[in-house]
């Protein structure tokens, strides 16, 4: 549980503390060690808990889904800087979702297409302009999908067919598109790295098994148009080297744009956290060193 975890953290801190001190001194730092602070010490922890509770009471804290880096082997999330990238050979598949879908898409991960809820095209791409806003029901390799054609300036016209299958649950970029366009989010890869029940006949398969089955199905239906060899950067866990899966997870969020009024507070009078943060920096009530970072 939580308490046991925190005890292990404290053990690690005790072991590492002297090493960190020596490293800092070797770098030439002359610090006032009497003012040393630790993120999880009593004073800092109390301040964080008090502020979290206050923000929760002011309706500034809410819980929602967010796509995270997930290691199916370690069963844990990874920060962006804990993800390593390894160049490897990969296949780029070009295919149509179904015979009655009007155009093809290209992807290196056909198994994630089981969770597609839209297809994005660049608004400047005249090939697809007439399809934007339309919706299609397709039978993709034996799984029913409802796809909406959306326009997004981030789509690279020159990559693949210029049409991007949007998988909100398993791509950071696609998740942002889904939020912006109010698209459904369907999780087809679970924490164990296997296909979920949402993908019907492929449930329980590994991603590689599902990929092979889907490509076989597309070939059988005459929908696979092209299979190209490319170089691809694979995201892997820095600890074990397992391929990282982007999956949605429950996270805590701060509503930085929500306007609130706090009685007796001179700042929060129908203003958001973002607005107040900018105001106090501009007035010089909070100093940011060096000053050049005030513009960020």
Regions found by a protein language model. Give the residues of each.
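Protease-associated
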Residues: 99, 103-166, 170-176
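Residue patterns forming the tRNA-binding/recognition surfaces of aminoacyl-tRNA synthetases
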Residues: 1-103, 159-296
């Amino acid at each position: 549980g939580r308490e046991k975890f925190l005890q292990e953290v404290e053990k690690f801190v005790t072991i590492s503390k002297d090493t960190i001190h020596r490293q800092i001194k070797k770098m030439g730092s002359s610090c006032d060690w009497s003012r040393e602070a630790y993120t999880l010490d009593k004073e800092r922890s109390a301040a964080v808990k008090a502020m979290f509770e206050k923000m929760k009471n002011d309706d500034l804290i809410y819980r929602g889904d967010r796509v995270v880096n997930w290691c199916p082997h370690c069963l844990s999330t990874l920060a962006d800087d804990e993800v390593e990238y390894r160049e490897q050979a990969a296949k780029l598949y070009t295919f149509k979702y179904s015979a009655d879908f009007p155009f093809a898409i290209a992807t290196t991960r056909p198994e994630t297409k089981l969770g597609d809820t839209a297809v994005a095209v660049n608004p400047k791409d005249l090939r697809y302009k007439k399809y934007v806003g339309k919706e299609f029901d397709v039978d993709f390799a034996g799984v029913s999908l409802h796809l909406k054609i959306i326009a997004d300036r981030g789509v690279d016209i020159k990559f693949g067919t210029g049409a991007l299958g949007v998988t909100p649950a398993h791509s950071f970029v696609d998740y942002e598109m889904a939020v912006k366009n109010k698209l459904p989010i369907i999780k087809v890869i679970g924490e164990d790295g296997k296909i979920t029940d949402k993908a019907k006949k492929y449930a329980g398969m590994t991603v590689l098994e599902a990929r092979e089955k889907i490509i076989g199905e597309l070939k059988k239906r005459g929908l696979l148009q092209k299979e190209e060899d490319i170089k691809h950067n694979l995201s892997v866990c820095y600890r074990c080297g397992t391929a990282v899966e982007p999956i949605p997870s429950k996270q805590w969020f701060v509503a930085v744009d929500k306007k609130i009024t706090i009685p007796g507070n001179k700042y929060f009078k129908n203003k958001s956290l973002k607005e107040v943060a900018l105001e106090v920096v501009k007035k010089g009530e909070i100093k940011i060193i060096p000053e050049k970072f005030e513009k960020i």
